[in-house]
């Protein structure tokens, strides 16, 4: 039985804190560093969803990464550890925060999965498959406002 909690942290920002401008669409538009510990036993891969639930037209997905190897414990800044899937921007890469107004929350949700490779080829299938295949989930959230 696993007693440790599956946790995700970042050297780029604190959970609930402000995302640096460099990680936004107003800055360098590079992904933040993310690191995790204690994935569930039986984890065969990871998948990452980065989204903004405060978007006026509904949740906006900024980054989708699948097939992150099970032995991975970190995503370096400005790097891709797996296969990217097309996001709400219509591109298969990280696109940082660009809120039209106000302060938005940006969630980085890391899923530990029971499969090595995901079948999902689009955003809708990606969300569905992570729910079906997840063993655990770790979340960190950063906030950002239009500069």
What kind of feature is each model-predicted range?
Residues 1-147:
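N-terminus-centered regions that define maturation/targeting leaders and the start
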